[in-house]
């Protein structure tokens, strides 16, 4: 999961 305010990336990981 990703912290609030962050989006999941298709290849995996999060973008904040």
From Swiss-Prot:
GO CC terms for this protein?
A: extracellular region
Q: List the disulfide bonds.
A: 2-14, 6-16
One of the record's GO molecular function terms: calcium channel regulator activity
Task: Recite the UniProt keywords alphabetically.
Answer: Amidation, Calcium channel impairing toxin, Disulfide bond, Ion channel impairing toxin, Neurotoxin, Secreted, Toxin, Voltage-gated calcium channel impairing toxin
Tissue spec. comment = Expressed by the venom gland.
Record flagged with keyword Secreted: yes
The main place the protein resides is secreted
Q: Report the locations given in the UniProt record.
A: Secreted
Print the miscellaneous field.
Negative results: does not inhibit human L-type voltage-gated calcium channel Cav2 (CACNA1A, CACNA1B, CACNA1E).
The record's comment on protein family reads: Belongs to the poneritoxin-Ae1 family.
Q: What does this protein do?
A: Weakly inhibits human L-type voltage-gated calcium channel Cav1 (CACNA1S, CACNA1C, CACNA1D, CACNA1F) (IC(50)=4.6 uM). In vivo, it induces reversible paralysis in blowfly L.cuprina.
Name this protein carries in UniProt: U1-poneritoxin-Ae1a
Organism of origin is Anochetus emarginatus (Ant)
